[in-house]
Amino acid sequence: MARRGKKPVVRTLEDLTLDSGYGGAADSVRSSNLSLCCSDSHPASPYGGSCWPPLADSMHSRHNSFDTVNTALVEDSEGLDCAGQHCSRLLPDLDEVPWTLQELELLLLRSRDPRAGPAVPGSLPKDALAKLSMLVSRALVRIAKEAQRLSLRFAKCTKYEIQSAMEIVLSWGLAAHCTAAALAALSLYNMSSAGGDRLGRGKSARCGLTFSVGRVYRWMVDSRVALRIHEHAAIYLTACMESLFRDIYSRVLASGLPRSCSGPGPGSSSGSGPGPGSGPGAPAADKERETPGGGAASGGPCSAASSASGGSSCCAPPATAATAVPPTTATAAVAANHHHHHHTLHEAPKFTVETLEHTVNNDSEIWGLLQPYQHLICGKNASGVLSLPESLNLHRDPQRPSKPGELPMFSQSELRTIEQSLLATRVGSIAELSDLVSRAMHHLQPLNAKHHGNGTPMHHKQGALYWEPEALYTLCYFMHCPQMEWENPNVEPSKVNLQVERPFLVLPPLMEWIRVAVAHAGHRRSFSMDSDDVRQAARLLLPGVDCEPRQLKADDCFCASRKLDAVAIEAKFKQDLGFRMLNCGRTDLVKQAVSLLGPDGINTMSEQGMTPLMYACVRGDEAMVQMLLDAGADLNVEVVSTPHKYPSVHPETRHWTALTFAVLHGHIPVVQLLLDAGAKVEGSVEHGEENYSETPLQLAAAVGNFELVSLLLERGADPLIGTMYRNGISTTPQGDMNSFSQAAAHGHRNVFRKLLAQPEKEKSDILSLEEILAEGTDLAETAPPPLCASRNSKAKLRALREAMYHSAEHGYVDVTIDIRSIGVPWTLHTWLESLRIAFQQHRRPLIQCLLKEFKTIQEEEYTEELVTQGLPLMFEILKASKNEVISQQLCVIFTHCYGPYPIPKLTEIKRKQTSRLDPHFLNNKEMSDVTFLVEGRPFYAHKVLLFTASPRFKALLSSKPTNDNTCIEIGYVKYPIFQLVMQYLYYGGPESLLIKNNEIMELLSAAKFFQLEALQRHCEIICAKSINTDNCVDIYSHAKFLGVTELSAYCEGYFLKNMMVLIENEAFKQLLYDKNGEGAGQDVLQDLQRTLAIRIQSIHLSSSKGSVV
């Protein structure tokens, strides 16, 4: 195909965007991504593209915004490659993710349909798991980056920031699934908080999750998602990732990829976009190939729109929404076709790299999410096909009337118009955009009311959301297509083009603009979408666009609600003007501003429930704070908790004071000023009352600000005060996550030591009912001074135990050791987590210290975790350790866990009553009817006895003809041993046998060979009685060789019970570590682990507690 020539001009970053003043230019303000920010270096484009292609002639045709759904350029496919590989920045690659492939496989196997067969670990291919992990890690980075930006407003990441980040990044349906999973996990966690064993179970176990919540929390801290991380945020993020994995895995299995399509889908060579065969230079045969979904592969058959505009089949764009496949059913058609092939071939769905890539490439909800580009591609699959997500698919529900006689909500023509509105990518004017947005909102709001599970939050609690005029103008700026203005006959096309059009493949549909803008507005509890919401959406959805994160301002949630009359709106505007005057920083406008604020004057609250003093503290404006204090501002007024009056209050800010905001943003001079002026050092906490918000000291300890913590402690802040959750669930009267726990959870060792050094404050002598019952003493006989000291010590011990739990969960083992060093006892869980981290960090001295501490753990605290987590960890350390001290310490632990009870005895097997002969006939040639030849010597026997002795003898005798007088030769058995076997049979039991010590092993082998179970058990019992440290390895090796499980288990019990002595035995060490390289050492360790697990279950975890051994 002849192609137009391209100018070999290296274009700058400005070519990627219409400069908004907020980004796109090379010197634009970049978002604060901290450790999640991307590298400025970019790999070279593998396809030779280095710039955006020039505008094509076909784009100058007269199309309205609806036609942009179906119109794309051939060069646009190359433009996307250019955008992804060179011109657009890429997401950072994670060296480590907060989950393991073993955990991922366990999660997926748990989520599969039980009818698909048993979930066997190791049944999923490792390469597919690794591929899936890598893809979903990109979604993790996207969500973390958005949560990081949202957390800047309050310098804290809570569950609300994670939930909003999910709604910003994920489609409506995926976000709804993730939110439901997060709510379920948090509910389980809160319910488990009331139990007495909450510090003895891991956070993941308490939440019902597979991935480690503590590891996700540590990842968030290390990635600097926020200065402060709430534990609920880590639970939400963990549940979100698990939900994403399950969702993608279920889609892969549901796709049922047929064998004929087992190769990668279009552009699926790397799962990151259209491949080399999708461009205009692909062979003609490839261009005519259709995808299984009915649409054309990238660069496939031309659509009706492109044909109508004069395009040929050789230069057609990728198949797009309304032509090759209906826009609302593109993804469904692909899945349906796959389902048909699946049933045709009668194959079980397979999870492989090929099926994974094929599913991702054909799913518009997840393809863009899992790409490596920094901007988020939404609403398109790998072929560039636009489609509505299933949650917005009106054709799925044919709008049947809910009541008899009621008309359908939309006609079919209206449905097509609405769908085209949602999928529009370009507009020609602000009027056209306003009409499109109106149609879309009109469609989404009733859909949300009808299908609450589709995740379309189109309603605020106080009413429907609406678009401010400035937001529409900003959105029009990004969606505007100058060529569409040429529809007006009075407007002539410009002769000089000063702007570069973005390619179609990077333009998001209108529904994605709405989704992201609505999520941003919802996060700040606003009634309306403003221009900043649109700019934030442009930053996410378009390549090369950036803008600063939204700051905390008084006008964030201001809106002229249509429900208010003119007088109320006038007062709102005056109040807004007053806040603006105070926020400008001019201290000479305080009096004029106060006169505009309303009847509450200087203490008037904004829609966010904050006073001018709070906003000044957020900015760190010391001069304005002083002026407001001089003007009579209340130091200790709290953010209100009445949502009906102040609906835009962020839930986490309720009961915060001006001092809290100053501490949040680390403005130490302002904190000093407020405290000198009489601010309460504990914020809103009243003496003796429950605390439902975090104190300033908790917030300072969480961020690790040593100077601020010292200042608050000097002013009398109490580090033992925790936070009560609003559901009323708390484990202590003072709440959870006190200052000790905050510092330990974030790994601030110096701040934690500072808190420990703080002298204890004496409390009131009034006892609570809980403390009266705990003390078990009479009030009249209580001596106040000792009681105060005792109560303080108990409260501090509870606080430190909780801090130890969080530090161990999050992997801050040094903080955990510091807490242990002051006498706080171990729980099994904290000890195991600390040992795991020390082993991962290869800290040998710390491992030795922790192993020595195991004996301090009470046996009453042994739980199932010791079997499922502890034993595999310790045996892994034993396997990897080359340190004799560590090996000896582990042997001590194993012997201790095995317990003082004796090894379970082997019992004789009662021989079934069979035929027997007088011993006189033993090896008697007279009257014998069968002769055995053993070591060249004959041994005479009788068939009547041997035929019923065992299946082995029956088979030997049956194989010889009756009239054959030849001898039956017995190999591999010595004559004396064979004589003992025959003596056992003729005498009817082992009682008369005289077995020498050097014959017992051979007799055991013979009994096993001839399948004489009673004689075999008798030999096993003799071996068990004669076992000692010298022969135990030989007996065990012989028993394993023969497959005698009972004797092997007895030997394993002997090993565990005497391991402290045996570890010095060279033969035993050789058995464990497999120095001969025969591969048996690992099996021995696994067998020992299994035997010890059974023993622990019987003596520590069963109801009998030791009686079953």
Swiss-Prot record:
- Report keywords, A-Z: ANK repeat, Membrane, Repeat, Transmembrane, Transmembrane helix
Which BP terms from GO are recorded? exploration behavior; protein stabilization; synaptic transmission, glutamatergic
SMART domains in the cross-refs: ANK (SM00248), BTB (SM00225)
Per its UniProt record, what SUPFAM superfamilies does this chain match? Ankyrin repeat (SSF48403), Histone-fold (SSF47113), POZ domain (SSF54695)
| Gly residues: bias regions | 264-280
What GO molecular functions are on record for this protein?
PDZ domain binding; protein heterodimerization activity
How does the protein's chain sit in the membrane according to the entry? Single-pass membrane protein
Q: Does the keyword Repeat apply?
A: yes
The record's Pfam families line, in alphabetical order, gives: Ank (PF00023), Ank_2 (PF12796), BTB (PF00651)
All copies of domain BTB, residue ranges:
928-994
Q: Where is this region: Disordered?
A: 260-302
Compartment list: Membrane
* ANK repeat copies, ranges: 608-637, 654-683, 692-721, 735-764, 830-859
Q: Name a GO CC annotation attached to this entry.
A: membrane
Record CDD domains: BACK_BTBD11, BTB_POZ_BTBD11, HFD_ABTB2-like
Chief location: membrane
Q: Where does the sequence pass through the membrane? A: 168-188
Repeat as UniProt keyword: yes
Annotated Gene3D superfamilies? Ankyrin repeat-containing domain (1.25.40.20), Histone, subunit A (1.10.20.10), Potassium Channel Kv1.1, Chain A (3.30.710.10)
- What is the protein's name according to its record? Ankyrin repeat- and BTB/POZ domain-containing protein 3
**Organism the protein comes from:** Mus musculus (Mouse)
